[in-house]
Swiss-Prot record:
Lineage: Archaea, Methanobacteriati, Methanobacteriota, Methanomada group, Methanococci
InterPro entries the UniProt entry points to: Zf-like
Organism from which the protein derives: Methanocaldococcus jannaschii (strain ATCC 43067 / DSM 2661 / JAL-1 / JCM 10045 / NBRC 100440) (Methanococcus jannaschii)
Name of this chain's protein: Uncharacterized protein MJ0836
Length: 119
């Protein structure tokens, strides 16, 4: 494999695989897929996947600390497939604007969750 390909693959594996070099790994479970380190559905407000917790100042914040679903290989792959399909004919700026639509992202979550339920 040429050096450019190796360097690119290294970046892909760091993002898509279990990034054991991350100081927080494993933040959910050993062997997790880290593609969605920052959940594209946050806050999903799906009580099967997380919950509101109280902060020190008394305000509430959505916690996904116990969510393993988005880090499963089948789920992470399907989310990526949905996003790629949605953005395939868009340039980067258009795609990011589209993905900024939280309601649209939650519809993707619902489709993926219907196909791959939380266990």
């Amino acid at each position: 494999m040429i050096e450019l390909a190796k360097n690119h693959l290294k970046k892909v594996l760091e993002v898509c695989g279990a990034n054991r070099n991350c100081e927080y790994y494993p933040c959910h479970f050993d062997g997790q897929v880290c593609l969605w380190c920052y959940c594209p559905f946050y806050p999903c407000e799906d009580e099967e996947l997380g919950e509101y917790v109280e902060k020190k100042d008394g305000t509430k914040i959505w916690s996904c600390m116990k969510c393993f679903w988005v880090h499963r290989e089948d789920v992470a792959t399907e989310i990526l497939r949905e996003i790629l399909n949605l953005t395939k004919d868009k340039d980067i700026d258009e795609a990011l604007k589209l993905l900024d639509n939280h309601e649209l992202m939650l519809k993707i979550k619902d489709r993926v969750k219907a196909k791959y339920p939380n266990r």
